[in-house]
Amino acid sequence: MKILLIGYGAMNQRVARLAEEKGHEIVGVIENTPKATTPYQQYQHIADVKGADVAIDFSNPNLLFPLLDEDFHLPLVVATTGEKEKLLNKLDELSQNMPVFFSANMSYGVHALTKILAAAVPLLDDFDIELTEAHHNKKVDAPSGTLEKLYDVIVSLKENVTPVYDRHELNEKRQPQDIGIHSIRGGTIVGEHEVLFAGTDETIQITHRAQSKDIFANGAIQAAERLVNKPNGFYTFDNL
């Protein structure tokens, strides 16, 4: 499989290493600013890249959105987070002409977490719910795209939910419909997501801890391996 990388930060550097270990080939990289240290051919436009079987994106909205407006037809794996609604609308449009895969978190374990959460929410309807995520001190967006995904699962199953991001400004007791959303940034934490169900005299915690960023890179590669043989359409872990 010949792979075009969109972005060449820490994540796509891992994708490159792991993909080559699996026998795949990196045919090019698209970056905001070309760098002399990038060990692959660098491009500015997707259409300029010849022979790629799939593109894997771990970048940012500033790089990705202009590329998505170009005229190209290439299976596309997208892991960029930020401006989610705009991104999903654009990917849905592109999926009419090419296979597109999107996940805010490329870990299959996190996908499993969403399924566990979907089963737990109806069973624990009277429990308060708090969501917490922790990441390294270089992550710029908060809350994480993964936490937003977990919140979306809850919203799909509960009515009149209210997200609460900053409780210290509230001088009132917690309301039953509140969903607390908390972000922690520090050190080199790869990624931790916890769902707390707090009831009367008991609590239940569901936690996913990433121990290496390789799980996200491998998840993207595995998605790409499946996507290249798919018909046009929008794919997630649910239908890939």
From Swiss-Prot:
Record key words, sorted: Amino-acid biosynthesis, Cytoplasm, Diaminopimelate biosynthesis, Lysine biosynthesis, NAD, NADP, Oxidoreductase
Q: In which pathway does it act?
A: Amino-acid biosynthesis; L-lysine biosynthesis via DAP pathway; (S)-tetrahydrodipicolinate from L-aspartate: step 4/4
Which CDD domains did the record assign? DHDPR_N
**Where does this polypeptide localize?**
Cytoplasm
- Tell me one GO biological process term: lysine biosynthetic process via diaminopimelate
Q: Give the EC number(s) under which this enzyme is classified.
A: 1.17.1.8
Kindly give the Pfam families that the UniProt entry links to this protein. Answer: DapB_C (PF05173), DapB_N (PF01113)
Domain of life, per the record?
A: Bacteria
Q: Which residues bind (S)-2,3,4,5-tetrahydrodipicolinate?
A: 136, 145-146
Q: What is this protein called?
A: 4-hydroxy-tetrahydrodipicolinate reductase
Organism expressing this protein natively? Staphylococcus aureus (strain COL)
